[in-house]
From Swiss-Prot:
SMART domains documented for this protein: Elp3
Cofactor(s) it depends on: [4Fe-4S] cluster
The keyword Secreted appears for this protein: no
Catalytic residue list: E108 (proton acceptor), C357 (s-methylcysteine intermediate)
Top-level division of the source organism's lineage: Bacteria
GO biological process terms on file: rRNA base methylation; tRNA methylation
Binding residue positions for [4Fe-4S] cluster: C128, C132, C135
CC terms in the record's Gene Ontology section: cytoplasm
Organism: Corynebacterium glutamicum (strain R)
Record-annotated disulphide pairs: C121-C357
Organism ancestry: Bacteria, Bacillati, Actinomycetota, Actinomycetes, Mycobacteriales
Function: Specifically methylates position 2 of adenine 2503 in 23S rRNA and position 2 of adenine 37 in tRNAs.
GO molecular function, one term: tRNA (adenine(37)-C2)-methyltransferase activity
Protein name, UniProt field: Probable dual-specificity RNA methyltransferase RlmN
Length: 366
């Protein structure tokens, strides 16, 4: 039997990138411009280029003095990531990008285009320390936290792609590599930049941003106290502690009841419905009694402020885990709904290009 991967909450300090414009607050940006001999009104111009026009190269910012553009580029706009592989599928509506960061670390994002919206799935860490055994990223371990700039620039890149196509990036989900609430301060700062109107941010509605977590209960409560209206998604995967201790090892620290209490606190503070993510795994967590228990526990803890997203498992190469058959999936949905909890099956865009957690990076590293 393989040795279990350990839980890691504190990311290694190594490898953080050079400081980027998005890493700094306005005071620090003004100070950086002052060091370049530029007045503070240039901040507004640069911000409008970055957040409004989605430009990250000061050499194209023609309203900046020509002699200062290279200096601004060198000081505030280092190259954070370069595309290593881009794969498209679902009739070119799904685009998976594997990015190589400045230190060689790999990062993934997935852009999914629908008829009525476009959604970007972004990463918050390079790797993940939560050690979930059915997740490719969790089994690969944690390399490091991403910087604010590395998170934000995933969004800018995708927004620029959509803009070039005549569309608009409408939704952001923190469901890529990493545990967002384990990189708390940077993720919250990134969310604020994603949602503030230009020139302070990209102007995407907070209600169109989803932050997922495996259940870091204190951080869920802390996020609630930020008084943002982002959607909270809790990766529960089973309603009983006995199995969840194995499927989601962080459950040994914060068990199901504590996670659901924190989720209720978030729902009460934000007024938002909480999303429960449940990867259905054949003969592991797909039993009728678990569906009944899930519905009962969620209805008791969250009432009408909950929705279950059932996720057909994306099998990882070489893994013993497999997706539950459709008939089992349909019965699971029926039983959860019968307990008074809305339950739907999540769209599986990107499965054929290994768009599930960390699979593309795992293949590249192999």
């Amino acid at each position: 039997m393989a040795t279990p991967v350990p839980l890691v909450f504190n990311a290694p300090k190594r490898g953080m990138p050079p400081t980027h414009f998005a890493d700094l607050n306005d005071e620090a940006r003004i100070e950086a411009l002052k060091e370049l001999g530029l007045p503070k009104f240039r901040l507004n111009q640069i911000a409008r280029h970055y957040y409004g026009r989605l430009e990250a190269d000061p050499l194209t910012m023609t309203d900046l003095p020509e002699g200062a553009r290279q200096e601004v580029k060198d000081a505030l706009f280092p190259t954070l990531m370069s595309p290593l592989r881009v794969i498209e599928t679902d009739d070119d509506t799904t685009q998976k990008t594997l990015w190589k960061l400045h230190d060689g670390t790999l990062l993934e994002s997935v852009l999914m285009r629908y008829s009525d919206r476009s959604t970007l799935c972004i990463s918050s860490q390079a790797g993940c320390g939560m050690a979930c055994p059915f997740c490719a990223t969790g089994q690969g371990g944690l390399d490091r936290n991403l910087s604010i700039g590395e998170i934000v620039d995933q969004v800018r890149n995708a927004a620029a792609t959509m803009q070039a196509e005549g569309g608009r990036l409408s939704n952001i989900v923190f469901m890529g590599m990493g545990e967002p609430l384990a990189n708390y301060k940077r993720v919250v700062s990134a969310v604020r930049q994603i949602t503030q109107p230009s020139p302070a941010g990209f102007g995407i509605s907070q209600r169109s941003v989803t932050v997922s977590t495996v259940g870091l209960a204190p951080a869920i409560r802390k996020l609630a106290d930020e008084e943002m209206s982002v959607t909270l998604a809790v990766s529960l995967h089973t309603p009983d502690d006995e199995l969840r201790d194995t499927l989601v090892p962080v459950n040994n620290r914060w068990p199901v009841a504590e996670v659901l209490d924190a989720a209720r606190y978030y729902a009460d503070k934000s007024g938002r419905r909480v999303s429960i993510e449940y990867a259905l795994i054949r003969d592991v967590n797909d039993q009728d009694w678990r569906a009944d228990m899930l519905g009962e526990k969620l209805h008791k803890a969250l009432g009408s402020r909950v929705h279950v997203n059932l996720i057909p498992l994306n099998p990882t190469p070489g893994s013993k885990w497999d997706a539950a058959p459709k008939a089992r999936q349909d019965e699971f949905v029926r039983r959860v709904i019968a307990k008074g909890v809305p339950c739907t099956v999540r769209d599986t865009k990107g499965q054929e290009i290994a768009a599930a957690c960390g699979q593309l990076a795992a293949e590249e590293s192999a």
